């Protein structure tokens, strides 16, 4: 049990984050955190939610941003916001900006994270909820990172399902487009969590306060 921190240990805030959010939301909030606490040292570990919770339990990180349910008897959990899952494509894709039925996506190539990843399991769950499956699509590309998915979509290799918040800037710049699907709506809670009774609870709340302040500054922005 980690009941104390060695006196000579640097004051490092060790945060874990979902890969996509680590490059967008967490990076922005961390900048504001360091503006308020310039003496702090920071380490950010990025990965899938299930991996982050393992790292949290092992003590490699002291808090994390995840998109999964965390039992209250084990974790201190705070909802940050709901993130919408959308279908994205290149601006030159035949369906870019259009509203279609789900089955109209089937003639195209689907791009997704590797089988076994939480992203893959989430995608499969979403598709099954609309009587669809990965194998309904004409073909697919399975990749290892979120950035690779984004790059392949931009190159018009295929379409993908991602959190809107993660690609909002690319949508705003016009390097990606959204495909609107009739009767499709999927939102997921994004949570900031740490272990129950953690020694680092006070420091974790400092970052939580920055998160809340940043989110309030966004107003009613649809994440």
Question: Language model features by range: what are they?
Answer:
Residues 8-37, 41-54, 202:
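N-terminal winged-helix
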Residues 7, 74-111, 115:
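Flexible hinge/capping segments at coil-to-helix
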């Amino acid at each position: 049990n980690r009941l104390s921190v060695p006196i000579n240990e640097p004051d490092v805030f060790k945060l874990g984050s979902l890969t996509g959010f680590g490059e967008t939301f967490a990076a922005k909030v961390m900048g504001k955190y360091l503006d308020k606490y310039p003496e702090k040292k920071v380490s950010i570990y990025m990965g899938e939610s299930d991996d982050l919770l393992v790292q949290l339990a092992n003590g490699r990180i002291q808090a994390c941003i995840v998109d999964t349910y965390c039992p209250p008897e084990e974790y201190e959990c705070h909802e940050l916001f709901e993130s919408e899952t959308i279908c994205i494509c290149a601006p030159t894709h035949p369906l870019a900006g259009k509203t279609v039925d789900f089955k109209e996506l089937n003639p195209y190539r689907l791009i997704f994270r590797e089988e076994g990843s939480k992203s893959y399991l989430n995608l499969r769950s979403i598709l099954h909820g609309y009587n669809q499956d990965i194998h309904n699509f004409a073909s697919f590309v399975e990749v290892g990172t979120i950035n690779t998915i984004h790059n392949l979509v931009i190159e018009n290799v295929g379409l993908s399902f991602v959190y809107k918040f993660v690609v909002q800037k690319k949508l705003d710049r016009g390097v990606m487009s959204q495909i609107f699907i009739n009767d499709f709506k999927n939102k997921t809670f994004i949570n900031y969590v740490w272990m129950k009774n953690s020694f680092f609870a006070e420091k974790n709340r400092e970052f939580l306060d920055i998160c809340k302040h940043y989110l309030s500054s966004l107003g009613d922005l649809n994440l």
